[in-house]
Curated annotation (Swiss-Prot):
Pfam families per the UniProt record, alphabetical: Pribosyltran
Record organism: Methanococcus maripaludis (strain C6 / ATCC BAA-1332)
Protein's name in the database: Hypoxanthine/guanine phosphoribosyltransferase
Annotated localization: Cytoplasm
Family: Belongs to the purine/pyrimidine phosphoribosyltransferase family. Archaeal HPRT subfamily.
Taxonomic lineage from the root: Archaea, Methanobacteriati, Methanobacteriota, Methanomada group, Methanococci
């Protein structure tokens, strides 16, 4: 595990909304400050864990964007962002997304049948976003080679595997206990 990622998670602020404790971290929220050293470290570790013999990297708007940008620059693999608004482009695929805190639509563009892809996102908690991405990519006829999230918080990995058959790789597993992030693995 990355020492930078681990230390930054252990010291990140926790905000309580209702009964849920949110951890506020540069990788998952873009605040308080995204240090280039942390982003470089995370993207380097991602590259070592994913299949790089792919045509495209796919992420959902918004916080996967800095990570896929760094990975794309380092690997020369182009990326696609599933957006929260439609563009009405030919072949656009809408898919419903439900997470633990929101519902909405995501829209997939730029994927062709047979494209080999890696899915990359910042955090997995409920698995709702990844299930939506996988479903959209299957509808597009993409060949999903890897699924990776930087931070695992919750039961989302199991949900994704049960609903889609895909295993989700992660860099670190955490939980929030007594107002602090605990590193589990």
């Amino acid at each position: 595990m990355s020492r930078l990622l681990e230390e930054s998670l252990k010291t990140c602020p926790i905000v309580k909304r209702g009964e849920y404790h949110y951890f506020i971290h540069p990788i998952s929220d873009g605040v308080p400050l995204v240090e280039p050293e942390l982003l470089r470290d995370v993207s380097t570790r991602v590259i070592k864990m994913i299949d790089t013999e792919v045509d495209k990297i796919v992420t959902a708007e918004a916080m996967g964007i800095p990570i896929v940008t760094a990975v794309s620059i380092a690997t020369d693999i182009p990326y696609v962002i599933m957006r929260k608004r439609e563009y009405l482009l030919e072949g656009e695929i809408p898919v419903h997304q439900e997470t633990g805190y929101s519902k909405g639509e995501l829209y997939l563009n730029g994927i062709n049948k047979g494209d080999k892809v890696v899915i990359l996102d910042d955090v997995i908690s409920t698995g709702g976003t990844l299930v939506a991405i996988i479903n959209a990519l299957k509808r597009a006829g993409a060949d999903i080679k890897d699924v990776l999230c930087i931070i695992d918080r919750g039961n989302g990995q199991n949900v994704v595997e049960e609903k889609t058959g895909y295993k989700v790789k992660t860099l670190v597993k955490i939980e929030v206990v007594d107002g602090k992030v605990q590193i589990l693995e």
